[in-house]
Amino acid sequence: SDFGDFLRSAGNTAPEDEPDLNKIHFNMDIFRAFAKGYIESAKSFLTPLEIEMLPYAVMLFPYMQAVRFLADYINGDTYYQIKYAEHNYVRTLAQYKLYQEARRAVPEMKEYISLLL
């Protein structure tokens, strides 16, 4: 989970509440650098299945965060601190866009991980 959550933040080319969705992309260079170091350190205790699932963790975390922001927005913004009325809604859209970008990158992430093993 640390792997996916780190890349939700570091792999995003924009802030998590970026209103301009065209600025949101998944940075594969950050993924490659982080995955290389992570797998080199963790492959001794991760199972092959856990390593295989790492790209899905990258995709899952922005999706989960989008759901959390949306739930908070619907429930009256009681959990996450907001700066303006639609802040959690904007965050929802931004995180969902990052999810879509990460989802498109899954084949490339899987290919890169296979080269590290």
Please annotate each region the language model reported.
Residues M64-L117:
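ATP/Mg2+ or Mg2+-diphosphate-binding catalytic cores
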Residues N27, T47-P48, K110, L117:
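General structural signal for secondary-structure boundaries
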Residues L46-V58:
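All-alpha amphipathic helical-bundle segments outside canonical DNA-binding/catalytic cores
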Residues I39, P55, Y84-H87:
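Sparse, context-dependent recognition of short Cys/His-centered cofactor- or disulfide-binding micro-motifs
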